[in-house]
Amino acid sequence: MLNEIKAKTKERMLKTIQSFHDDMKGVRTGRANASLLDGIVVNIYGGHQKLNQVAGVSAIDNKTLSVKVWDATAIGEVKNAIINANLNLNPVVEGNTIRIVLPDLTQETREKLVKLLHQFSENARVAIRNIRRDVMEEIEEMKKNKEISEDDFHVAKKEIQNITDDNVKKVDDDLSIKEKDILHH
Protein backbone atom coordinates (compact mmCIF):
# COMPACT_ATOMS: atom_id res chain seq x y z
CA MET A 1 0.00 0.00 0.00
CA LEU A 2 2.74 2.47 0.96
CA ASN A 3 4.83 1.49 -2.07
CA GLU A 4 1.79 2.27 -4.22
CA ILE A 5 1.48 5.69 -2.58
CA LYS A 6 5.20 6.40 -3.10
CA ALA A 7 4.99 5.38 -6.76
CA LYS A 8 1.91 7.56 -7.27
CA THR A 9 3.67 10.47 -5.55
CA LYS A 10 6.75 10.13 -7.78
CA GLU A 11 4.53 9.96 -10.87
CA ARG A 12 2.55 13.08 -9.91
CA MET A 13 5.72 15.03 -9.13
CA LEU A 14 7.31 13.90 -12.40
CA LYS A 15 4.29 15.28 -14.28
CA THR A 16 4.78 18.59 -12.46
CA ILE A 17 8.43 18.70 -13.52
CA GLN A 18 7.49 17.83 -17.11
CA SER A 19 4.99 20.69 -17.09
CA PHE A 20 7.72 23.00 -15.74
CA HIS A 21 10.01 21.88 -18.58
CA ASP A 22 7.24 22.58 -21.10
CA ASP A 23 6.86 26.09 -19.66
CA MET A 24 10.62 26.64 -19.88
CA LYS A 25 10.75 25.50 -23.51
CA GLY A 26 8.78 28.57 -24.52
CA VAL A 27 11.38 30.92 -23.03
CA ARG A 28 14.02 32.13 -25.49
CA THR A 29 17.66 31.66 -24.63
CA GLY A 30 19.11 33.76 -27.44
CA ARG A 31 19.72 30.73 -29.67
CA ALA A 32 17.29 29.50 -32.29
CA ASN A 33 15.48 26.41 -31.05
CA ALA A 34 12.47 24.80 -32.75
CA SER A 35 10.82 24.21 -29.36
CA LEU A 36 10.41 28.00 -29.03
CA LEU A 37 7.35 27.69 -31.29
CA ASP A 38 5.89 24.56 -29.60
CA GLY A 39 3.05 26.39 -27.87
CA ILE A 40 1.76 28.16 -30.98
CA VAL A 41 -1.75 27.26 -32.11
CA VAL A 42 -2.92 28.07 -35.65
CA ASN A 43 -6.56 28.91 -36.45
CA ILE A 44 -6.96 26.82 -39.57
CA TYR A 45 -9.49 24.63 -41.38
CA GLY A 46 -12.27 25.89 -39.10
CA GLY A 47 -10.46 24.77 -35.95
CA HIS A 48 -7.26 25.01 -33.96
CA GLN A 49 -4.11 23.05 -34.82
CA LYS A 50 -0.73 23.07 -33.13
CA LEU A 51 1.92 24.60 -35.37
CA ASN A 52 3.86 21.33 -35.54
CA GLN A 53 0.76 19.66 -37.05
CA VAL A 54 0.65 22.03 -40.03
CA ALA A 55 4.36 22.80 -40.50
CA GLY A 56 7.86 21.55 -39.83
CA VAL A 57 10.03 23.79 -37.68
CA SER A 58 13.81 23.68 -37.70
CA ALA A 59 16.75 25.84 -36.69
CA ILE A 60 18.84 26.93 -39.68
CA ASP A 61 21.53 28.52 -37.51
CA ASN A 62 21.89 30.13 -34.06
CA LYS A 63 19.64 33.06 -34.97
CA THR A 64 17.22 31.70 -37.59
CA LEU A 65 14.21 29.38 -37.53
CA SER A 66 12.60 27.93 -40.63
CA VAL A 67 8.90 27.03 -40.66
CA LYS A 68 8.04 24.85 -43.67
CA VAL A 69 4.24 25.02 -44.08
CA TRP A 70 2.86 21.85 -45.66
CA ASP A 71 -0.25 23.47 -47.15
CA ALA A 72 0.65 26.62 -49.11
CA THR A 73 -2.88 28.01 -48.62
CA ALA A 74 -2.28 28.10 -44.84
CA ILE A 75 0.87 30.24 -44.91
CA GLY A 76 -0.98 33.44 -43.92
CA GLU A 77 -2.66 31.79 -40.93
CA VAL A 78 0.65 30.32 -39.76
CA LYS A 79 2.40 33.69 -40.07
CA ASN A 80 -0.40 35.40 -38.11
CA ALA A 81 -0.26 32.74 -35.38
CA ILE A 82 3.49 33.35 -34.98
CA ILE A 83 2.97 37.12 -34.81
CA ASN A 84 0.06 36.79 -32.36
CA ALA A 85 2.05 34.50 -30.03
CA ASN A 86 3.66 37.62 -28.48
CA LEU A 87 7.16 36.19 -28.75
CA ASN A 88 8.54 39.39 -30.30
CA LEU A 89 9.20 37.59 -33.60
CA ASN A 90 9.04 38.97 -37.12
CA PRO A 91 8.22 36.15 -39.57
CA VAL A 92 9.08 36.64 -43.26
CA VAL A 93 7.30 34.56 -45.93
CA GLU A 94 9.49 33.02 -48.65
CA GLY A 95 7.34 30.71 -50.80
CA ASN A 96 6.05 27.83 -48.62
CA THR A 97 8.55 28.68 -45.91
CA ILE A 98 8.48 31.26 -43.16
CA ARG A 99 11.87 32.48 -42.01
CA ILE A 100 12.22 33.94 -38.53
CA VAL A 101 15.39 35.78 -37.56
CA LEU A 102 15.51 36.02 -33.80
CA PRO A 103 16.37 39.47 -32.49
CA ASP A 104 19.24 39.76 -30.03
CA LEU A 105 18.12 39.70 -26.42
CA THR A 106 18.69 42.95 -24.56
CA GLN A 107 19.80 42.80 -20.93
CA GLU A 108 16.36 44.06 -19.91
CA THR A 109 14.67 41.29 -21.91
CA ARG A 110 17.01 38.69 -20.40
CA GLU A 111 16.11 39.87 -16.90
CA LYS A 112 12.37 39.69 -17.70
CA LEU A 113 12.82 36.16 -19.04
CA VAL A 114 14.69 35.12 -15.90
CA LYS A 115 11.89 36.61 -13.79
CA LEU A 116 9.38 34.56 -15.80
CA LEU A 117 11.48 31.42 -15.25
CA HIS A 118 11.51 32.07 -11.51
CA GLN A 119 7.72 32.35 -11.61
CA PHE A 120 7.47 29.01 -13.46
CA SER A 121 9.84 27.36 -10.97
CA GLU A 122 7.94 28.71 -7.97
CA ASN A 123 4.68 27.36 -9.44
CA ALA A 124 6.34 23.96 -9.84
CA ARG A 125 7.70 23.98 -6.27
CA VAL A 126 4.26 24.92 -4.90
CA ALA A 127 2.64 22.12 -6.92
CA ILE A 128 5.21 19.63 -5.60
CA ARG A 129 4.62 20.75 -2.01
CA ASN A 130 0.85 20.48 -2.52
CA ILE A 131 1.30 16.90 -3.72
CA ARG A 132 3.39 16.21 -0.60
CA ARG A 133 0.67 17.70 1.61
CA ASP A 134 -2.03 15.55 -0.03
CA VAL A 135 0.05 12.39 0.38
CA MET A 136 0.94 13.21 3.99
CA GLU A 137 -2.77 13.64 4.76
CA GLU A 138 -3.44 10.29 3.11
CA ILE A 139 -0.84 8.43 5.19
CA GLU A 140 -1.94 10.20 8.39
CA GLU A 141 -5.47 9.00 7.68
CA MET A 142 -4.11 5.47 7.20
CA LYS A 143 -2.32 5.67 10.57
CA LYS A 144 -5.44 7.02 12.25
CA ASN A 145 -7.48 4.13 10.82
CA LYS A 146 -4.78 1.68 11.97
CA GLU A 147 -4.06 0.59 8.38
CA ILE A 148 -0.35 1.20 8.99
CA SER A 149 1.81 1.09 12.11
CA GLU A 150 3.37 4.11 13.80
CA ASP A 151 6.81 3.00 12.53
CA ASP A 152 5.58 2.61 8.94
CA PHE A 153 3.98 6.03 9.20
CA HIS A 154 7.26 7.69 10.20
CA VAL A 155 9.25 5.80 7.54
CA ALA A 156 6.70 6.75 4.86
CA LYS A 157 6.66 10.36 6.01
CA LYS A 158 10.44 10.55 5.74
CA GLU A 159 10.46 8.87 2.31
CA ILE A 160 7.79 11.25 0.98
CA GLN A 161 9.82 14.20 2.28
CA ASN A 162 12.94 12.83 0.53
CA ILE A 163 11.03 12.43 -2.74
CA THR A 164 9.76 16.00 -2.36
CA ASP A 165 13.24 17.36 -1.63
CA ASP A 166 14.70 15.53 -4.66
CA ASN A 167 12.04 16.96 -6.96
CA VAL A 168 12.36 20.51 -5.63
CA LYS A 169 16.14 20.22 -6.12
CA LYS A 170 15.56 19.06 -9.72
CA VAL A 171 13.41 22.14 -10.38
CA ASP A 172 16.08 24.40 -8.85
CA ASP A 173 18.89 22.74 -10.84
CA ASP A 174 16.96 22.95 -14.12
CA LEU A 175 16.12 26.59 -13.42
CA SER A 176 19.77 27.38 -12.76
CA ILE A 177 20.87 25.82 -16.06
CA LYS A 178 18.24 27.69 -18.08
CA GLU A 179 18.96 30.95 -16.24
CA LYS A 180 22.69 30.70 -17.06
CA ASP A 181 21.79 29.93 -20.66
CA ILE A 182 19.75 33.13 -20.91
CA LEU A 183 22.11 35.44 -19.06
CA HIS A 184 25.33 34.30 -20.72
CA HIS A 185 24.43 34.02 -24.42
UniProtKB/Swiss-Prot annotation:
A Pfam family per the record: RRF
Gene Ontology cellular component list: cytosol
Keywords from the named record: Cytoplasm, Protein biosynthesis
Compartments it resides in: Cytoplasm
Example GO BP: cytoplasmic translational termination
Main subcellular localisation: cytoplasm
InterPro entries listed in its UniProt record: Ribosome_recyc_fac, Ribosome_recyc_fac_dom, RRF_sf
GO molecular function per UniProt: ribosomal large subunit binding
CDD domains xref list: RRF (cd00520)
UniProt key word Methyltransferase: no
The keyword ATP-binding belongs to this UniProt entry's keyword annotation: no
Similarity annotation: Belongs to the RRF family.
NCBIfam families: frr
Function statement: Responsible for the release of ribosomes from messenger RNA at the termination of protein biosynthesis. May increase the efficiency of translation by recycling ribosomes from one round of translation to another.
Name by which UniProt lists this protein: Ribosome-recycling factor
Organism per entry: Wolbachia pipientis subsp. Culex pipiens (strain wPip)
Gene behind this protein: frr
